[in-house]
Amino acid sequence: MDALEGESFALSFSSASDAEFDAVVGYLEDIIMDDEFQLLQRNFMDKYYLEFEDTEENKLIYTPIFNEYISLVEKYIEEQLLQRIPEFNMAAFTTTLQHHKDEVAGDIFDMLLTFTDFLAFKEMFLDYRAEKEGRGLDLSSGLVVTSLCKSSSLPASQNNLRH
């Protein structure tokens, strides 16, 4: 095999694995946006959000909650992916994800990060608690809507685009 054939083979192999990765990420987006998943996650967070406090020290109760979350949510996502891709392997995907993390939409990556990064998991709960208690980020007072069109001296009923 000459060098050109080797490059071609590597390119087609890379493209196939990239296509598989992209397909999994697409399915993940569908699963995470699905009402069933949203309800599953919301019910779990409703059950435990009052346990979480915005302090440096972590309570002992956080560990079993984190483990239960991983078991429940990761298992659900893996089952959903296996229905769509029978040969799916979560461990292999997680490894591939580390190499492609810059290519994955932020919300998907953040969600997956909550399975492996305790601080991301805790932050998710703190954000949820703040939202439930009405302490969420409110940008409404800083928003101003400005028309991008020039105002016209014609009444609105006569201000039609002319082609």
Swiss-Prot record:
Biological processes per GO annotation: maintenance of protein location in nucleus; positive regulation of tyrosine phosphorylation of STAT protein; signal transduction
One Pfam match: ARL2_Bind_BART
Impact reported for residue 111 to A: Does not decrease interaction with ARL2
Annotated Gene3D superfamilies: ADP-ribosylation factor-like 2-binding protein, domain
Molecular function terms from GO: GTPase regulator activity; transcription coactivator activity
Coiled-coil residue spans: none
Keyword field: Cell projection, Ciliopathy, Cilium, Cytoplasm, Cytoskeleton, Disease variant, Mitochondrion, Nucleus
Subcellular localization: Cytoplasm; Mitochondrion intermembrane space; Cytoplasm, Cytoskeleton, Microtubule organizing center, Centrosome; Nucleus
Coarse class of the protein's main subcellular location: cytoplasm
InterPro entries for the chain: ARL2BP, BART_dom, BART_sf
Keyword flag DNA damage: no
GO CC annotation, single: mitochondrial matrix
Tissue-specific expression: Expressed in retina pigment epithelial cells (at protein level). Widely expressed.
Effect of residue 76 to A: Decreases interaction with ARL2
Family of the protein in this entry: Belongs to the ARL2BP family.
Record note on quaternary structure: Found in a complex with ARL2BP, ARL2 and SLC25A6. Found in a complex with ARL2, ARL2BP and SLC25A4. Interacts with STAT2, STAT3 and STAT4. Interacts with GTP-bound ARL2 and ARL3; the complex ARL2-ARL2BP as well as ARL2BP alone, binds to SLC25A4. Interaction with ARL2 may be required for targeting to cilia basal body. Interacts with STAT3; interaction is enhanced with ARL2.
Disorder association: Retinitis pigmentosa 82 with or without situs inversus: An autosomal recessive disorder characterized by variable association of retinitis pigmentosa with situs inversus. Retinitis pigmentosa is characterized by retinal pigment deposits visible on fundus examination and primary loss of rod photoreceptor cells followed by secondary loss of cone photoreceptors. Patients typically have night vision blindness and loss of midperipheral visual field. As their condition progresses, they lose their far peripheral visual field and eventually central vision as well.
Described purpose of this protein according to its UniProt entry: Together with ARL2, plays a role in the nuclear translocation, retention and transcriptional activity of STAT3. May play a role as an effector of ARL2.
Protein name: ADP-ribosylation factor-like protein 2-binding protein
Organism the protein comes from: Homo sapiens
Annotated gene: ARL2BP
